[in-house]
A protein has these predicted regions:
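Conserved adenylation A10 loop of the ANL superfamily
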Residues: 119-132, 244
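Conserved beta-strand scaffold positions in the cores of enzyme catalytic domains, especially
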Residues: 131, 165-167, 339, 530
Length: 578
């Protein structure tokens, strides 16, 4: 039987003169220019200390006459010790009064910049959303970090270079402050700032972030992308990747009909002005492509990205922390496409830049922010906490990361726990473990989200299983407190299989967390228990959580450890535990 794998360019329409010109002429120039910047970045890892100090004292000097700078004595700070003495470690609450004035137009409360492009909104994974000013320095560092990431990925995968890119971005104009400054996702702003000739490489239009219905965004991405040899997909959260793949298979008949007829299914709800601008492109019929895809479906019965996009396509998404359960499902949908972690990046700024496939570790981005580290287990807010610079870290040790940024955050505890996995030159390589907030301690066991995800990953691997969304949560009982695994009824097929997963996780937690083992042996903790939930529960729960915190779908991370002790009892009262 002939293969229908999309390995031949003949399966896609000819790219056309303009796109060919981009790859040949513009592509060569960009590769040379950005490659030179990447080499400078990699070379700089040999001397991070002077770069970090120049960045720190540059920020202090620049903002010394702001109200925050005067209130905290920036002008008198001469050394790192002075800086740490004048400005204790803090969360967002310290800067919020100044930030509120910036939102009202009083920029000098916190920043010396006269221009604020927008406010980046946090993802809503902790409490409520926070606003982060995007000034020129923030934007330059943000774009430089992505350039370094992309150039290194293309250098390692030259077949993918300067070919169509599918990137999911958010809306940078979700709302507006009282002073008229837009608030939203930085990805939306940077998409609008790209040169038109470069934008032709992107499958989705720059304002696709304004599509609020996620199913419609997936459908449009597939409708436009099925006719192009997409060679890079960027969506920070791997759940987005899987949902995209599933959406394409679920809607394969509608997609092929649209490609054949030159239409867009009316269930795809996109803004009218966007639809009008895409009308000419959507009206093009693709009978040859439809014929090929029909052959794929006849052969396999399904239609996944591995069937319609080249195998040299690069998947850019998070791979660390709790992402393992999603990544194990990738081969089914994406075959052997390369996976490149996009790095530890948040609305507050980029922290790491990964440079290898299948490795969540990345180089500390020493040019974007000034970084400090507190050994995990110490309280970062304590005046006696140990604070280290990047070059002082120890390989194998875990740390809480602190940021001082161009956006007015100083010694800011972002609650991220990272592990130093080694060094490039003298600059640390860091992998994300979990949010410091995702930490449970019923009776001294100090269970982290990292413990949970590692136990689940290993249990699934040993049992030869896959898992959908899940969470572990503390379950209070006056006599036998314990932890529960909360999964939907169809997650593992049968209750017996789910119980095997629970039993294996219980053993692994005891092996990898000596405090958990001690509390189990002493009877202070009962064993992990199984809680089955109705199908669709987690999708609804995540949706409600996103709505409550006004989070961004593309940035959202489902918590694999829920720390509230009443989670199980609340579900039981609502009759949701089966």
């Amino acid at each position: 039987m002939p293969s229908h794998r999309p390995e031949f360019s003949a399966q896609f329409e000819h790219p056309g003169l303009i796109e060919a010109m981009i790859r040949s002429t513009v592509g060569k120039f960009l590769s040379w220019s950005l490659g030179r910047k990447l080499r400078r970045f990699l070379d700089s890892t040999n001397a991070p200390h002077p770069i970090q100090h120049a960045l720190l004292f540059g920020l202090l000097h620049k903002n010394r006459n702001t109200d925050f700078g005067r209130d905290h004595g920036f002008a008198g700070i001469q050394t790192l010790a002075d800086f740490r003495k004048r400005i204790p470690v803090a969360g967002y609450d310290r800067v919020e009064p100044y930030m509120a004035r910036v939102r009202q137009g009083d920029t000098k409360a916190l920043l010396s910049d006269k221009r604020i492009h927008m406010f980046a909104l946090t993802s809503g994974t902790t409490n409520t959303r926070k606003t982060i000013p995007v000034n020129d320095q923030y934007l330059d560092a943000y774009r430089a970090g992505w350039h370094n990431w992309g150039v290194k990925a293309y250098a390692d995968h030259p077949d993918a270079s300067m070919r169509p890119i599918l990137q999911f971005s958010g809306d940078w104009q979700e709302e507006t402050t009282s002073s008229g400054v837009p608030c939203g996702a930085v990805t939306g702003l940077t998409a609008t700032m790209q040169k038109r000739i470069v934008r032709r490489l992107y499958v989705l239009p720059s304002d696709s972030g304004k599509i609020k219905d996620i199913a419609s965004k997936y459908y449009l991405a597939l409708r436009l992308g099925l006719t192009r040899p997409v060679s890079m997909i960027i969506a920070a959260n791997p759940s987005t990747m899987i949902n995209l793949a599933r959406a394409g298979n679920d809607a394969k008949e509608d997609l092929l009909r649209d490609l054949c007829d030159g239409t867009l299914n009316p269930r795809c709800k996109i803004p009218a002005d966007l639809h009008a601008r895409l009308s000419r492109q959507l009206a093009i019929k693709h009978p040859a492509r439809v014929s090929h895809l029909e052959g794929v479906i006849r052969q396999s019965g399904t239609l996944y990205p591995k069937d319609y996009w080249p195998s040299h396509c690069i998947l850019g998404n998070w791979t660390g922390g709790s992402m393992g359960a999603y990544l194990r499902q990738y081969p089914r949908y994406f075959g052997n496409m390369a996976i490149r972690d996009v790095g530890l990046i948040a609305s507050e700024g980029r922290m790491t830049t990964p440079i290898e496939d299948n490795n969540s570790s990345g180089i500390l981005d020493i040019h974007s922010s000034f970084f400090e580290f507190v050994p995990n287990g110490e309280d970062p807010l304590s005046p006696t906490a140990t604070c280290l610079e990047g070059h002082e870290l120890i390989s194998g040790q875990e740390y809480r990361i602190l940021l001082t940024t161009a956006s007015g955050l100083y010694r800011y505890d972002i609650h991220d726990v990272v592990r130093c996995t080694g060094f490039m030159g003298r600059t640390p390589l860091l992998e994300f473990l979990n949010k410091g907030a995702y930490f449970s301690n019923l009776t001294g066991e100090k269970l982290s989200e990292h413990h949970v995800t590692r136990a689940m990953d290993r249990a699934l691997r040993e049992l030869g299983l896959e898992s959908g969304t899940y969470s572990v949560a503390p379950c209070w009982d006056d006599h036998h407190p314990n932890y529960g695994l909360f999964v939907e009824t169809t997650n593992f097929g049968t209750r017996d299989t789910a119980q095997k997963v629970v039993a294996r996780m219980e053993n692994i937690l005891a092996e990898t967390n000596i405090e958990y083992a001690s509390k189990r042996e002493s009877g202070r903790l009962a064993p992990l228990n199984l809680n089955l939930l109705p199908d669709g529960f987690w999708a609804n729960w995540d949706r409600e959580r996103l709505t409550k915190t006004r989070g961004v779908q593309e940035q959202y991370k489902h918590p694999c450890l829920i720390t509230t002790v009443d989670f199980q009892s609340d579900l039981a009262k609502r009759g949701l535990i089966i």
